[in-house]
A protein has these predicted regions:
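Acidic, amphipathic alpha-helical patches
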Residues: 1, 60, 264
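Positively charged, low-complexity/disordered segments
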Residues: 1-7
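Nucleotide and nucleotide-moiety/phosphate-recognizing core
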Residues: 8-9, 13-74, 82-104, 288-289
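Small-residue (G/A/S/T)-rich helix-start motifs and N-terminal tracts that mark the onset
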Residues: 8-9, 13-36, 64, 69, ...
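Short, structured secondary-structure boundary patches
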Residues: 41-49, 76, 243-250, 396
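Short, flexible loop segments at the rims of nucleotide/cofactor-binding pockets, characterized by
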Residues: 47-52, 78-83, 250-255, 277-280
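Short acidic loop-to-helix transition motifs that present clustered carboxylates
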Residues: 55-58, 108-112, 135-136, 306-309
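Internal gly/pro-rich beta-alpha loop/helix module
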Residues: 68-69, 74-167
Length: 485
């Protein structure tokens, strides 16, 4: 079903190969407005190719019924807005009747820049996108409609061209992460594996600290400890027998109290990495803890309520107060869309494109190579000063309470154990996000997509590492499926 140049040219090539091709077009070849597309369409009509112009719904159903594959080449990357006839009839018909649909560049009806579907859209089994993936295929409705993505190389020197062109983001392939799967050396001890302090929890949310701490340990940290309000410290101790818990003075509501800042900061100096935020609330004491940790000379991850504390401190947006978070040591912020919107004082963040833009405001304001914002969403973006990376996206089952606490713990364990990766922070964090995604796939397989809860992910971090390592080796052609090596 074509009204674009690529669709018509594809029909010519397929007919040369003996493939029985029917073309569905809204107009006669001579009526196509674009000169090059009109020329190709005329060539197509001159071949032994059946062209059906403006079929009714019933006529289209007959054509689809006899087709093994329907190629969707209706709209290109410039489409936006609402569908008009006949496409508002054809697209639902294809979705209802076709067994296999392959879309060219983007599924017709999808906005290639935002990933938004306003009316209806082709649901493709595969999308062959030309030259480079489009951001809309990863944003908003894009993943639901695009199916499996294949990038078509239209130019022999494409890599050289792409390197010279500004691009929104880079896709992280499994093989890019292969260096992170090296086995532990035999002479290692728990401290040289990296130590993590989890500053988290409250009487209302003790589970967040528990999940983050267990995840950091599963991700490889040799020594993990928790600093939590004394109102919930004993509960956390009972849940984590292998992890020390520091009881920090709390306020009347069971959150960090006024004396917490000095105590937490003194403890934090001894650790390879500090994770602050899960379940800690935004009490006055919690806000002081966040401010104090930002001043310390230690790698820091700010998650959940730590980010909400930042947003409350800088009511006009943290990008207007970069001195507050500009530091020498690594700083990672892990906001989801709503948290990110609060960090930039209410800028609308509702899809991948707006999330990247908001994250870049924060990063560029500080201008530090050590600051990375991980904008969490259906497709998570790792945003640094010079590059934006898109690691493997997880299943929908990861959209569950506590999943972010698990990811924060994985990030902390990863940062603590691999601090020598200072020249490529974004890729290191992509590895951590990918592990979280692999754990999500493993949990969905084990428990069913709708039944996954956050604690299911933690014990699957180890198997997730094995899956990720296998995919990395296969992506590089080092190990074939079924190999014993």
């Amino acid at each position: 079903i074509a009204q674009c140049l690529v669709g018509s040219e594809m029909c010519i090539r397929d007919s040369h190969k003996g493939v029985d091709v029917d073309i569905v077009s809204p107009v006669e070849p001579d009526e196509i407005p674009a000169a090059l597309a009109r020329h190709v369409a005329r060539r197509t009509a001159g071949r032994d190719v059946h062209v059906c112009v403006g079929p009714s719904r019933d006529e289209l159903e007959v054509l689809i019924d006899k087709a093994d594959v329907v190629v969707d080449a209706i709209f290109g990357t410039g489409f936006h807005g609402n569908l008009r006839a006949p496409f508002s009839i054809w697209i639902p018909t294809v979705n209802e009747c076709a067994d296999c649909v392959v879309s060219i560049d983007v599924p017709s009806g999808l906005n290639a820049e935002t990933g938004v579907v306003d009316d209806d859209c082709i649901r493709a089994e595969h999308t062959v996108t030309m030259i480079a993936p489009k951001i809309g295929l990863y944003s908003a409705d894009g993943p639901e409609y695009a199916g499996d993505l294949i990038c078509g190389n239209l130019y022999d020197r494409l890599d050289e061209v792409i390197d010279d062109v500004d691009h929104a983001a880079e896709i992280v392939e499994p093989g890019d992460l292969v260096d992170y799967f090296a086995p532990l050396p035999t002479n290692i001890d728990k401290y040289s594996r990296g130590s993590v302090l989890i500053v988290a929890g409250s009487a209302q949310y003790p589970g967040a600290a528990i999940m983050a701490a267990k995840s950091a340990a599963r991700a490889g940290a040799g020594y993990v400890a928790v600093a939590a309000p004394d109102a919930c410290a004993n509960l956390i101790r009972m849940a984590l027998p292998s992890i020390p818990v520091f009881a920090i003075p709390s306020d009347s509501r069971g959150s960090f109290g006024a004396a917490a800042r000095m105590t937490v900061c003194e403890i934090a100096k001894k650790y390879s990495c500090v994770l602050c935020g899960p379940g800690m609330t935004t009490s006055a004491g919690a806000m002081q803890v966040v401010s104090g940790l930002l001043e310390l000379d230690v790698p820091l991850i700010l998650d959940a309520d730590a980010l909400n504390c930042l947003a409350k401190i800088a009511i006009d947006g943290i990008d207007s107060n970069p001195e507050m978070y500009r530091r020498e040591q690594p700083l990672v912020m892990t906001p989801h869309y709503r948290e990110l919107s609060r960090l930039v004082a209410g800028d609308e963040v509702n899809d991948l494109g707006t999330a990247i833009a908001a994250a870049q405001k924060v990063v560029w304001a500080a201008g530090s190579d050590n600051l990375v914002v991980i904008a969490k969403g259906p497709t998570t973006a790792i945003c640094g000063v010079e590059r934006v990376l898109l690691p493997l996206s997880g299943p929908a089952s990861l959209a569950t309470a506590g999943s972010g606490d698990v990811l924060a713990g994985i990030l902390a364990g990863t940062l603590a154990t691999m601090r020598d990766e200072m020249d490529r922070w974004e890729l290191l964090y992509s590895y951590a996000v990918a592990l979280h995604s692999y754990a999500g796939f493993a949990a969905a397989t084990e428990y069913g997509e709708k039944s996954v809860i956050a604690t299911d992910l933690i014990d699957l971090i180890g198997p997730a590492m094995e899956l990720a390592a296998k995919d990395a080796l296969e992506d590089l052609g080092i190990m074939n499926e079924g190999s014993d090596d």
